[in-house]
Amino acid sequence: MRKLISLILVIIFPYISLGLSARIAFSEKFIEWEYSRKNFPEDRWGMEKEERLKLAKLGLKAVISDKGMEEFKKARLKNGKRAFTDREVKHMEDVKRFLSFFFPSVYVLSIIWIAGVFLLRSFDVLIWSGIFNSLLLLFLGILTFTNYEKAFELFHNVVFDPYSWKFRYSDTLIRIYPMKFWYDGTLFVAILSFLFGILVLFTGILGKKFLKGKGA
């Protein structure tokens, strides 16, 4: 039973590290940082950065709160036109539904993982969790960044209705969240998740050495 619990804890750790990293990325600070970068693409139809940034933050609020979604639906461009089409609103509602399951599941599994580690009192779980996390991320990273647009499309087709998330370049969602935004966001999540794994790995190694030294 102890080995089975250890195996389960090791297997769920990458889900936890990726989920927590994604939650950190889903923040206004990340959006502000991304928009402040010199190589962030300008809007080809001339929308000012301030307006794009405001709408991008509103999109974030929309997928994490009911109030934000209501504001998102009512949003207007500076010219008075409706900012988002019904199709764009529908997709963001789909994203909100997905995140309402995904993030809570990450929190629950995080608690289970921490409780399991304390229950087993084994630094080996930390070590193997870190190793498995690093190897899996390396594998997924190679697959993802070899052809990012294809990986992006595959992910969306699996998680959402394949016909619900594709938009025209002139649609506001594409203008405020260009592919560069998602590429950088994915890279940020991957790196942060990798660092989480390394931290857990070295915590396990140092803890094991400490116990050995104490026993000696």
From Swiss-Prot:
Alphabetical GO CC annotations of the entry are: plasma membrane
Q: Which InterPro entries match?
A: Lit
Topology with regard to the membrane? Answer: Multi-pass membrane protein
Q: Where in the cell is it found?
A: Cell membrane
* Membrane-spanning parts: 5-27, 98-120, 125-147, 185-207
Cleavable signal peptide: none
Top-level lineage group:
Bacteria
Instruction: Please provide an example of a Pfam family that matches this protein in its UniProt record.
Output: Lit
UniProt keyword annotations, A-Z = Cell membrane, Membrane, Transmembrane, Transmembrane helix
Under which name does UniProt file this protein?
Uncharacterized protein aq_2036
